[in-house]
């Protein structure tokens, strides 16, 4: 090989080495730059993550600090409230102790004052006793000196003189005590009666002796009468009730004084009208069925009454007799309603006096039981009631209450007296019992006639169902003093000339009016 070829080979080798070196250097620098960039990126990511973790940790720390602060504040408030409560309790106890201390001081002062007063009274009594003893000794000596009496004789004379001097004072004191007792008893009785009346509400009832059966048409009247009057005669014979068929449109009137028979006839006739088959055999069947329905209704009314009043344990026959009072009236007042009212009033008054309320209601409910069958059995309703109560083994207090509520016997218990009082209250209250319209109007007219017969009376008015009369007088003719005299005179004439239940209030009104008109 020639030296030129060798030189070229060497130069090429050197060139290759130089080129390789620079290529490698470039590659190495590129790798180093990439690594540096990667490291910087990793470092940046690490810083960002660290910053995020730092912020998150700060937030969590702040939340925890806030929570701890709230809990601490809550605990502080609770402790402060507890301390405040304890402080209030201590203050209250301190105030209570102060009040007790003041009360004890007052009591101590009061006791000292009473003790001082008692000592003064004791001293005064001792002084009076010594004076009395001295006076007695002086009188004894004087009597012995004057009359030469012995000590025992003088003592007897002194005792008689003292007794005579004090007997009048003792009688006055006893009379005053008796009057006070009567006044207190009257007040207590009025209070009990007023409370009982306020707490008891009752219906006002009216008496009736007729019932009306409505008909679908007037043709039914001919069917009720029947051929030659057979149907109406059969119905009247079976029920004992008069049928009045007149010009009243679509109605038949049943007239009779026995409400049970009248109700039986009404139910029977109503069933016959609804059924349409009206002949003697059908009438007998319906009347018998109606009697059974009325009997069932009477028993139900008795049971309902005992339940409403609160009286239990009555004999079944006595309950049925009690239910018959539903169809019994006295002066227009339904006797069953009256008996219930008396039972309630008696129970209310008994509760005020501390008596047996149940027994009182029982006595009040049964006090008029005799009226249920007094038209069937001989004797007064009181006698019949006593027999029924004895027959069905009622309590002796109940029997005595029945026997004494009209004064036939003496009451032996407070309950018997209460029954009589409740009976009078129920019968005497306004509207409880009725009178005939003619007598009522005549009594009102007589009241006004008596009032207007006096000179100076301008007009009179009978009001409140005749229980009060108001007289308007002329102020120029009658002065205030004459108005009182006029009221007394009219009251006396009413008492002498009229028969009336209860009381009539006489009111004289004298009125003077002065009228002027401003123009």
From Swiss-Prot:
InterPro entries assigned to the protein according to its UniProt record, in alphabetical order: HD/PDEase_dom (IPR003607), HD_domain (IPR006674), HDIG_dom (IPR006675), KH_dom (IPR004087), KH_dom_type_1 (IPR004088), KH_dom_type_1_sf (IPR036612), Ribonuclease_Y (IPR017705), RNase_Y_N (IPR022711)
GO biological process: mRNA catabolic process
Keywords, in A-Z order: Cell membrane, Endonuclease, Hydrolase, Membrane, Nuclease, RNA-binding, Transmembrane, Transmembrane helix
Gene Ontology CC annotations of this record: plasma membrane
Localisation per UniProt entry: Cell membrane
Origin: domain of life: Bacteria
Keyword DNA-binding attached: no
Topology in membrane: Single-pass membrane protein
Gene Ontology terms, MF aspect: RNA binding; RNA endonuclease activity
Record-annotated HD domain positions: 335-428
A Pfam match: KH_1
Transmembrane annotation, as ranges: 3-23
Keyword Amino-acid biosynthesis assigned: no
Entry EC number(s): 3.1.-.-
Annotated ranges, domain KH: 209-272
Enzyme class: hydrolase
Purpose of the protein: Endoribonuclease that initiates mRNA decay.
Family the UniProt entry places it in: Belongs to the RNase Y family.
Protein name: Ribonuclease Y
Organism in which the protein naturally occurs: Bacillus licheniformis (strain ATCC 14580 / DSM 13 / JCM 2505 / CCUG 7422 / NBRC 12200 / NCIMB 9375 / NCTC 10341 / NRRL NRS-1264 / Gibson 46)
Record gene name: rny
